[in-house]
Amino acid sequence: MNENISNESSQKFPMRPVAPLGVIAMNGCEEMGRRVNEYLMNWQVDSSSDQKLHSFYGSDKNGFLLEAHCPRFGTGEGKGMIKDTVRGYDLFIICDVGAYQCTYKLYGREIPMTPDEHYADLKRIIAAVSGKAY
């Protein structure tokens, strides 16, 4: 029985994705998003890969990162905006709710973002992705 398990686990998993891959780096995670994108781009063109991914989103010079941001209104309320189409994509959203270096303007003053506000922005992006902005 152990031989069957080890034989099955040693087989290569297919590397070809089912859907295009997209990565959204939220406010405060831009550097991490760039590193993930760089890794994916290097993996994509790696000569050891048996299946090339040139027909999928990310094979161009822009990579897998999707442009998204959450602008704030003067009252502090915000909205999630995604600049690219995401229909049919496998999305990964990178968010650091403890990124206190992120600020926004509220009544003309710079306010550091709390974990609650990062989480609210994450929910706004998820709502924008699903097409049901509330």
Predicted regions and their residues:
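PRPP-associated nucleotide enzymes
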Residues: M1-Y134
